[in-house]
Amino acid sequence: MIVDLESRVTDLETRLAFQDDTIQALNDVLVEQQRLVERLQLQLVALAKRQEEMQGSLGAADEDEAPPPHY
């Protein structure tokens, strides 16, 4: 009876140790993914700003041009 309980406690302690390791590994991956998401968000904002600037400069150039002769 005592041996069985000791075995069960040892098994539970082993499982707990593996669960702690798994939780830490998952947390590390989550932190890495969050950093990646933040970098991607910054890149997206920069690309959107760049696109707006390019569209603005193209729009201004189009307004200065005379209409084609068929108008």
UniProtKB/Swiss-Prot annotation:
Alphabetical list of Pfam families matching this protein: SlyX
Record-linked InterPro entries: SlyX
Family from the record: Belongs to the SlyX family.
HAMAP family: SlyX
Protein name: Protein SlyX homolog
Gene (name only): slyX
